[in-house]
Amino acid sequence: MSKLKTRKSAAKRFKATATGKFMRRRAYHNHLLDHKSSKLKRHLSTKAVVDERDADNVKLMIPYA
């Protein structure tokens, strides 16, 4: 069987943890940040865990993670 290809766009967006979960960036932290509070911006700068309902799709896109 041939090797599976990794979707490079997904590989740049998601990182696997040691336990097999995937981490992602939060939305709403790219631009238009003036009216957002410091607390919100600090929260948005942290990583989030990919929801378990989406984890299977991410795993298919990054087979060797």
UniProtKB/Swiss-Prot annotation:
SUPFAM superfamilies given in the database record? L35p-like
Any GO BP: translation
Q: Kindly state which keywords UniProt assigns to this record, in alphabetical order.
A: Ribonucleoprotein, Ribosomal protein
Pfam families for the chain? Ribosomal_L35p (PF01632)
Does the keyword section mention Ribosomal protein? yes
The molecular function terms of the Gene Ontology recorded here are: structural constituent of ribosome
Q: Which InterPro entries match?
A: Ribosomal_bL35, Ribosomal_bL35-like, Ribosomal_bL35_CS, Ribosomal_bL35_sf
Q: Name one GO cellular component term.
A: cytosolic large ribosomal subunit
Family annotation (Gene3D superfamilies): 4.10.410.60
Q: Per the record's keyword annotation, is Secreted included, yes or no?
A: no
Check the record and name the NCBIfam families matching this protein: rpmI_bact
Q: So what family is this one in? A: Belongs to the bacterial ribosomal protein bL35 family.
According to UniProt, the name of this protein is Large ribosomal subunit protein bL35
Specify the species. Prochlorococcus marinus (strain MIT 9312)
